[in-house]
């Protein structure tokens, strides 16, 4: 028997809820306020079938462009034929959570500003570029302290 090509195909693990989190949605999901221009993460809740986005958008970060009483309009960028297309989705609140993108970005900006201020006081120029992890420095390996050479045994015929 051939497999189906349904709307929720191959989502058994993707939409599964974590251990001890099954059941109803917590009230904090509904009480969170969203404003136009905020960044949100689309995380599909498999127990809520209404307003569920397509599986491709699970885990994507988007920008809120519309707020309704029970749903949120989110702009997500999707690659189609080698170019980015702006997709506008309306997703129910159960499938959305606030994103930490802005908080991480603002922390980095504050650290950069502080480093620049310290550099100006010292009269040095500070680079705020993010560098990839550099290779480890060379280390000389030393032998064990109590190393004993192998003993010579006589041959057995």
Swiss-Prot record:
The keyword Heme does not apply. The keyword Ligase does not apply. It comes from the Eukaryota. This is Large ribosomal subunit protein eL21. It comes from Tetrahymena thermophila (strain SB210). One of its GO terms (biological process) is translation. Residues 110-132 are annotated as: Disordered. The gene is RPL21. Coiled coil: none annotated. One of its GO terms (molecular function) is structural constituent of ribosome. InterPro entries: Ribosomal_eL21, Ribosomal_eL21_CS, Ribosomal_eL21_sf, Translation_prot_SH3-like_sf. Belongs to the eukaryotic ribosomal protein eL21 family. One of its GO terms (cellular component) is ribosome. Keywords: Ribonucleoprotein, Ribosomal protein. PANTHER family: 60S RIBOSOMAL PROTEIN L21.
